[in-house]
């Protein structure tokens, strides 16, 4: 049995196919979704979406949004998403280092909040670019 997973951003469809299982980062922690999961709607946090397909795990960096699960259909609407295989690990690491430096030099509440969000996004991209063993 499979699940139909759709990952959508405002600009494009990132994923639209059947999967065996997913692990989704929500605002209240990670949840695993298998076929025949109870229907839910949840907020999606900045984090990794893990997808099991053909007994292999794939990753995707999600940048916050919402998910709806029901009748073996999963729709994930996010601000942005990138498949782990599409992320250049060196570029992601450089972005992380810049984000860490920006957090240290941020002044004022707004700058600190924006710098910390950029740091979370950068960490997520680095994590997604590393294959799951």
From Swiss-Prot:
Entry-linked InterPro entries: ATP_synth_F1_dsu/esu, ATP_synth_F1_dsu/esu_N, ATP_synth_F1_esu_C, ATPsynth_dsu/esu_N
UniProt record, GO biological process: proton motive force-driven ATP synthesis
Any one Pfam family match given in the protein's UniProt record, by short name: ATP-synt_DE_N
Superkingdom, taxonomy of origin: Eukaryota
Topology term for the membrane: Peripheral membrane protein
Keyword Transmembrane helix: no
Major location category of this protein: plastid
Alphabetical list of Gene3D superfamilies matching this protein: 6.10.140.480, F0F1 ATP synthase delta/epsilon subunit, N-terminal
Keyword set, alphabetical order: ATP synthesis, CF(1), Chloroplast, Hydrogen ion transport, Ion transport, Membrane, Plastid, Thylakoid, Transport
Protein function: Produces ATP from ADP in the presence of a proton gradient across the membrane.
Family: Belongs to the ATPase epsilon chain family.
NCBIfam families named among the record's database cross-references: ATP_synt_epsi (TIGR01216)
Subunit-structure text: F-type ATPases have 2 components, CF(1) - the catalytic core - and CF(0) - the membrane proton channel. CF(1) has five subunits: alpha(3), beta(3), gamma(1), delta(1), epsilon(1). CF(0) has three main subunits: a, b and c.
Protein name according to UniProt: ATP synthase epsilon chain, chloroplastic
Organism of provenance: Solanum tuberosum (Potato)
